[in-house]
Amino acid sequence: MSEQFEHISVLLHESVDGLAIKPDGIYIDGTFGRGGHSRLILSHLGENGRLYGIDRDPQAIAEAQTIDDPRFSIIHGPFSGMAQYMEERDLIGRVDGVLLDLGVSSPQLDDAERGFSFMRDGPLDMRMDPTSGISAAEWLAEAEADDIAWVLKEFGEERFAKRIARGIVEHRENPDKKPLTRTKELAALISDVSPFRDKHKHPATRSFQAIRIYINSELDEIETALNGAVKVLAPQGRLSVISFHSLEDRMVKRFIRKNSKGPEVPAGFPLTEDQIKALGSADLKMASKAIKPSKDELGDNKRARSSVLRLAERL
């Protein structure tokens, strides 16, 4: 059994304050994790309030089951299923706030057995839900060099993607080499084939991020979850999203911007005002500028340094 690891919720108060919680409201914590955000949300709710937590990590589900509160329910599944879960509960268009804390959590990173970190030796797994899908080791044992390079470039913005992919495949095809099954083995290989050293960043940082994102379909999950949030939110309901790297943040920023605009009609196009309105209207409005951690929080938690909070309101 994995040991317990501390998790410090990033932008905790800012993200929960951004929900503008109503005591009798209905809320979703789409990334329960170890429950930091959920517990704070519950502290703001009255006896008629309701909170649904969602997570696909069995360890998160075990933690959620320690919360003995009739206002709280946990759902085991990906947050991309948010709209479906709420439809099953007849809550489409009735939710007052959705919080998403994207990416991998500190306990997942710190637990070597999960295989997320190049800093700790463990099985090369990287699955958010270890009970489903293929592991990173299984994928790397089969994927073509071009496919590996594409993943490293697309999801890690890795400048040496082709060189690293070629190194992985050459290692795999060498009969004198053991298959890559451990995080330290992959990290060492990447270090060996990378020609450039950044004193502030391990050579494997971007590759591990990219492989993790691919294995868990993270960006597709985020896109589906954001669309699901728009569907489940009531008018004036709040969306609070914390991201940790530029790919996530760009996606969230573009989503809010896109859904804050009405239909684009070319200038001079022969439509009446009523016809334009019939095409639809904006779904969201930005509720705040991007929020970053305070100096105090950065001093207490170095993992907060890349985090960004974006808030939107349902129209």
Curated annotation (Swiss-Prot):
GO molecular function: rRNA (cytosine-N4-)-methyltransferase activity
Binding residues for S-adenosyl-L-methionine: 35-37, 55, 79, 101, 108
rRNA processing is among the record's keywords: yes
Keywords noted in UniProt: Cytoplasm, Methyltransferase, rRNA processing, S-adenosyl-L-methionine, Transferase
Catalytic reactions on record: cytidine(1402) in 16S rRNA + S-adenosyl-L-methionine = N(4)-methylcytidine(1402) in 16S rRNA + S-adenosyl-L-homocysteine + H(+)
Subcellular location: Cytoplasm
Pfam families referenced in this protein's UniProt entry, alphabetically: Methyltransf_5
Enzyme class: transferase
EC number: 2.1.1.199
Source superkingdom: Bacteria
GO cellular component labels: cytoplasm
GO biological process terms on file: rRNA base methylation
InterPro entries cross-referenced by the UniProt entry: RsmH, SAM-dep_MeTrfase_MraW_recog, SAM-dependent_MTases_sf
Record function comment: Specifically methylates the N4 position of cytidine in position 1402 (C1402) of 16S rRNA.
PANTHER family: 12S RRNA N4-METHYLCYTIDINE METHYLTRANSFERASE, S-ADENOSYL-METHYLTRANSFERASE MRAW
Similarity-based family: Belongs to the methyltransferase superfamily. RsmH family.
Name of the molecule in the record: Ribosomal RNA small subunit methyltransferase H
